[in-house]
């Protein structure tokens, strides 16, 4: 990022808040290649992994020579965006990746400056980057809560909403026009946002740009929503000058001058929602609002959120997209886990002089279970098994080397084991390992035109080692499997703080 700042400081266009000229700079595409989600588009030869500066130079030259970016939607049907149909997709990919880097510039630098200013006050915690850090939070907080709102965040009904949201941060009109061009000219290529799936919404062709737009959209909503939650929880009188500067934030507030009046009005609006135990968690398009309050309070929050989205963000959300769950009776489906709070009885025998009696102490425990049916469905969709969970051979991999086939199956198995290690019941996970192990054996047997039994007999125990995680290997060397300590480590939940995404097979949302 320091190198990125050095380039930007030398560029006069950035000094005047003009982002559009940056799209003609070669180093922008270099950063897009280094940090983009789809790195293959700037590779001249994917086998050699070499960055093709020639493609970028040719693209910039074409943009200088002709007004390609001013073509209307009528011309896009003729596939003459850059003169050739097969180059159209490649050049669009490169520009969208570069434009994504450009739009991230003001927010990245703003974040760095804010962190540097507060470096002495804020404790740096890299562990909070892991999505597994959510579950220890659940274990600490959910035991004392009663209800949960499971929220599917609504998607923008019109792409212009995304542009309008961004224009309050990006003052360069040319860049915003270019963004509109990307969204409207290519919205038929696996559209930006689809209502069928809540957050499996991004075209894999433009992930960086679309992820940035959606995350920025959600961040804008959350910045206001978290402010409302703080007001309802603590009703503190603090300064909210940054929010007052935004035109679209509560239009009636433009006539308010004093922060006291601003805070007073929100106290009147939110007094029915007062709750000192309110917790908010989000991952992708799903969020959770947990409270210790009553069901009436949760219904108030539900319909307040619906009106809040519709009135102030032009987002249509139906009541059925927000579910109210009582933790003591219903499981919570979140991040490919079934989570619930269950009561365990602990009977203690007490002896007092000559009298003895039993004391039954109910203890709450946070329980997480692997969602086996959707996971088997994902394996079936990937052709590792049939819909009933019976392993089958992966025919498309039979052309690979034996070591590559075993490595691929083993990597998938280790990734799933790593992610689902926090499950309190691991029997379902053993079934997934069995499916992958036998599917691998059948794939190898099909390749060598042999039987599974004969192939397993020839490979021996070395074949199974690929399907063990590193933790299981270490534990098997240190502790015998029949010891009580080893059984506790194998069966107990184990959350990792280095997981930043859900494995593709685990992500069925």
UniProtKB/Swiss-Prot annotation:
Protein name: Maturase K
Lineage: Eukaryota, Viridiplantae, Streptophyta, Embryophyta, Tracheophyta
Localization of this protein: Plastid, Chloroplast
PANTHER family per the UniProt record, alphabetical: MATURASE K
Gene from which this protein is expressed: matK
Keywords: Chloroplast, mRNA processing, Plastid, RNA-binding, tRNA processing
GO terms classed as biological process: mRNA processing; RNA splicing; tRNA processing
A Gene Ontology cellular-component term: chloroplast
UniProt superkingdom: Eukaryota
